[in-house]
């Protein structure tokens, strides 16, 4: 399904549904952390300790923070006699570099999901392995 087609349904997800989605991603991400670390070490030559202790946890941190932010976020606000409603903007195009690959992916994907946006992700062609594992995580 294309991101544009998926946006019609996903943009209507309730706040609670998006929180549950982020919780599920966090849980699966945690289980797959060793695999993600191995992918980062393979694709960019980072020492496994750096991949395990910094690279992979930084990506997880973005999802944890997006969930916390979403839990307390108000999508509607009254200003004087007006009601301001914040809605998903549409499909996001995400391009990520080779360095800190999982961090760069997560810092873009997590808030897009929290906002109700779908996306097309173009990971680095130099370091695509962690993106492949990450995309598998999203197949909940």
State the predicted function of each range.
Residues 1-80:
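N-terminal Rossmann-like NAD(P)+-binding subdomain of aldehyde/semialdehyde dehydrogenases
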Residues 75-140:
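Rossmann-like NAD(P) dinucleotide-binding subdomain of oxidoreductase/dehydrogenase enzymes
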């Amino acid at each position: 399904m294309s991101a544009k087609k998926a946006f019609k349904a996903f943009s209507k997800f309730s706040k609670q549904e998006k929180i549950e989605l982020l919780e599920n991603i966090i849980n699966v991400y945690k289980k797959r952390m060793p695999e993600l670390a191995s992918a980062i070490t393979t694709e960019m030559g980072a020492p496994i300790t750096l991949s395990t202790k910094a690279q992979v946890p930084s990506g997880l941190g973005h999802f944890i923070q997006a969930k916390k932010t979403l839990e307390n976020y108000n999508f509607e606000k009254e200003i004087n006699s007006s009601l301001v409603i914040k809605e998903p903007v549409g499909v996001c195009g995400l391009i990520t570099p080779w360095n800190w690959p999982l961090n760069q992916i997560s810092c873009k994907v997590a808030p897009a999901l929290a906002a109700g946006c779908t996306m097309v992700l173009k990971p680095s062609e130099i370091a695509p392995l962690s993106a492949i594992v990450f995309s598998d995580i999203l197949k909940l």
